[in-house]
Each structure stands twice: as structure tokens, then as C-alpha cells.
């Protein structure tokens, strides 16, 4: 996709809080004039340790958090975690999908790529440890973006989403940890399971956690677990 123009407007909002969270809202106009705002978190030692490259995690929210109010993005997932954990060891980027789009749309996928490119260019990101995760609509977006750019990510964590079976051959070398609730009636567990089975048949690096008694919210337990972040950090992609 050829980018016709790129208007980059960056507003930095610094706040002092218990979690030492630094937040930035970005209004980023690209092809088709998508305004993409996001929450941005830097680890507490980012400025004091000037020689470290930091892992980055991209979080994609669900359908109900679309719109133009960034407060909605803070309700679930990574934005909620960074408010609670002082020592969260990732740069965290949590964009908000405009109401008229979903994450799987081609224009949104391009907007996410452009957003990550800007972050990598302007911050000390360890390019061997860039991860993508999302829930529900964001779970679908995680599958799609990982398939679009498997060269960019070191691992992916789609939660209660689903993917395109045609992309399995592209994804088979990417470490993927899939989560779903066994009683999910919004996005059926089969949406995750068909991708897991196909990746297993292809020899993929996939693992699957099914919460037998969970409904659609299979993300709270997932993002609350230190094991998730340990697993992410254990995965690096080869140097370019």
C-alpha cells in the first residue's frame, strides 16, 4: 500500500503517578485519513537506563472499546496491567480503533504498521522482542497482523479471537500462545481451535490454553498471569 501522505502530530502528556506511567496520545493521519490515537507506556527505568533496548508489546482492544475516548482502552488488558504494576518491563502501545473500522481491515493494519515504525524510530526498542496481543476483535487483529508481518514480531498472543486458515503456512515459525474460554458464546472456542490444530499439523510453534469455565472474558486471567510475560520475554526473533 502506497502512503500518500503522513501527518504526524504528537502530543506528550507527562503525569506522575504511582505506576510511573508516561502516557502519550498520538493523532496520526495516513492514507484514507485514519486518526489513530493510542496510549503509550514506558518502563520506569527507561530514562535512567539509557543503554537498554526495551521489549515492546502492542495491545489491540476489543469491539466495545472502539471510538474516540481513550479512557475506554484502559478498561481491559495491557493498559489495565500497567496501571497496577510498577515494574512492567515492556514499552506498551495500545491504540484505539475508530468506530467505523475493525483491526483486520487493511487500512487499519497499515496504520498499525506505521505506528510501530514511528515508535521504533523514536524510542529505544529491542527490535528482536516486539510482541502483539489482543482480545476478541483484537484477537482477530492479532492473528491478522502477525500473518501480515511475521518478520516483525517475536511472538503473538491472540485471546478469544480467530484467524484465517490460509495464513497458517506464514505463521508456522512464529511462537503463538492462544487463549480462549470454553463457555465463550460470543466468539466460539472453535475459532481458536481450528487455527491451533492447523498450526500443529504444519509443525508450528503454538500452544493453547482453554479455560473450561470461562465465558468471553478469557483475557483477565491471561493478562494477570506473570507466566505470560515470562514466556513473551523468552522469545526473540533473529537479528535483521
Task: Place the predicted regions along the sequence by residue.
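Bacterial Sec-dependent N-terminal signal peptides
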Residues: 1-22
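Alpha-helical scaffolding within the catalytic cores
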Residues: 72-83, 160-169, 190, 194
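Active-site machinery of serine-nucleophile hydrolases
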Residues: 56, 60-113
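A domain-start/cap signature at the N-terminus of enzymes
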Residues: 17-56, 133-135, 140, 145, ...
